[in-house]
Amino acid sequence: MTEKIKELFSNYGGRFSAVWGLVIFWLAVDFFVRLGLALYSASQVSFSLWTLVKMFVVGFFFDLSVALHGMIPLVLYLAIVPRKWFDRSWNRWLVRGFVWLGASLILFGAVSEYFFWEEFQSRFNFIAVDYLVYTTEVLKNIRESYPVFPLIGVIGLLAAVVTWLIDRYLLVWKTEVNWKKRVGAVLLFILFPVISFFGMSGNYKNISDNMYNDELAGNGLYELFSAFRNNELDYHRFYRTLPDAEAEAILRAQLEKSGG
């Protein structure tokens, strides 16, 4: 079975087998993150069939867009390595290192999303951007609140297992792909990220009247970079407010009391 899978990858993009392995892993992790967060907030999430279908389908396209964007550096590296070097020992270990690093970051992102959701019932947003800006204070609070180093150790070990599985079942080292085909593969690969960058909007995740389902239809990393780019936060969602009429009445009463 392993050889048949590798033969398939060898014939169809074997040089980029590390990319396909990481993309598959990333999509699987995002699926289970979405499912896990939905179950965590089961009392607030709508579990109607049509809403769930929309949530997972729309979420899949957000996940795919993020995964393909994230793989661009590895795709470029795999494309430029000459054929005579591709099967060398140093390149094998370098690619395995890329896979391990990618798997570690994917798992770290999943764990971070859980803790962020636990506190804010939301995917990453502008609050997460502030966390990145005020890194020193945030890291201190995180170290005091969570077992950071044990978590990092577990993530590293799990990433090593994932790397071993991808290496054993998917990675192909002997490929005969000339530079023209490599350039064509790169252009095809980045086509979807380019289309999604200009054609997708974070508003596409608004699939229902339920705020939780809308958040779950999105993708944490997509929302993080969207918040960083747009520099905005839904004030009415994250801060307690009064109806405009009630707030105006209170303000008028205070002005009259002070003689204003």
Can you annotate each of these PLM segments?
Residues 2-234:
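Transmembrane and membrane-interface helices of multi-pass
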Residues 220-260:
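Membrane/wall-proximal cationic-aromatic binding patches
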